[in-house]
Curated annotation (Swiss-Prot):
This is Large ribosomal subunit protein uL3. Transmembrane segments: none annotated. One of its GO terms (cellular component) is cytosolic large ribosomal subunit. Keywords: Ribonucleoprotein, Ribosomal protein, RNA-binding, rRNA-binding. Belongs to the universal ribosomal protein uL3 family. One of the primary rRNA binding proteins, it binds directly near the 3'-end of the 23S rRNA, where it nucleates assembly of the 50S subunit. Part of the 50S ribosomal subunit. Forms a cluster with proteins L14 and L19. One of its GO terms (biological process) is translation. The lineage of its organism: Bacteria, Pseudomonadati, Bacteroidota, Bacteroidia, Bacteroidales.
Amino acid sequence: MPGLLGKKIGMTSVFSAEGKNLPCTVIEVGPCVVTQVKTLEKDGYSALQLGFVDAKEKHTTKPLAGHFKKANVAPKRHLAEFKNFEGEHKLGDVLNVEFFSDADFVDVVGTSKGKGFQGVVKRHGFGGVGQATHGQHNRLRAPGAVGACSYPAKVFKGTRMAGQMGNERVTVQNLEVIKVMPEHNLLLVKGSVPGAKGSILLIEK
């Protein structure tokens, strides 16, 4: 689906017309530059590759430097591909936050905050042991049994255990656009979005 790249600025709250206090996320959206146009005839599908945030040439690999030179645009730090754009677009076109409008509903894709290696209580919401006394020793937050006896004699895939938590791709769907601020390239969406402040997001219609 069509969309743009953006950067999470932080959270705030605004009042609705009914006087309700709405939590919302401020996202800096664009300007995004078209770095590649994919067509049905040449590539088998139609899409736009967009670049976001200027990068220094010394920090750009040679293949990417050639890619940007071919498109006649400055090197970009972040690239993403979006399908099903309407209308004609050519290399070097600039798309900004005016691509969205008030009351739109968008999907936001980002990388969640990494929490490191966590146990089952924090990672999966296990309740822990019920009896905290009467001889119980250091098993308060243990996962308990992970399998049966001699049959099936294995631990099934997908069993909830301790492990790496967060730092994964997360999509939040149907967030309402509260306000578009083109003079500052800002987009206010209702609710929270994944990632820390300054993280890169994909905002899709």
